[in-house]
C-alpha cells in the first residue's frame, strides 16, 4: 500500500477517508512549525512514498525542511497550488501510478 505525506492545510480527516476509498495511506501534517518540525518531518518522510505540499497552506520554513529531507531520503516532492485535500491526494496518486 502506498503512503502519501500531505503537508499543509486542516483537512486530515477528510484525506484519511479519501485515501481509504483509493486504497492508499495518508500521513497528514498541518505544515505549521510549532517551534520545530525537523524531528517530526524526518520520521514521517522516512515512512512515505511521495510528499505533496499544499502551497496555499504551508509556511516557508516547513517547505524548506521538507525539501531538505526529501532530497536526503530520495522521496519525490510535489506541489499542489491550492489547499484542497482531493487535489493533493490526486497529485500524489498520479505520481505513484506513473512511477
UniProtKB/Swiss-Prot annotation:
Keyword field: Plasmid
Pfam families associated with the record: DUF2325
InterPro entries in the cross-refs: UCP020408
Similarity section: Belongs to the UPF0751 family.
Protein name in the entry: UPF0751 protein BCAH187_C0172
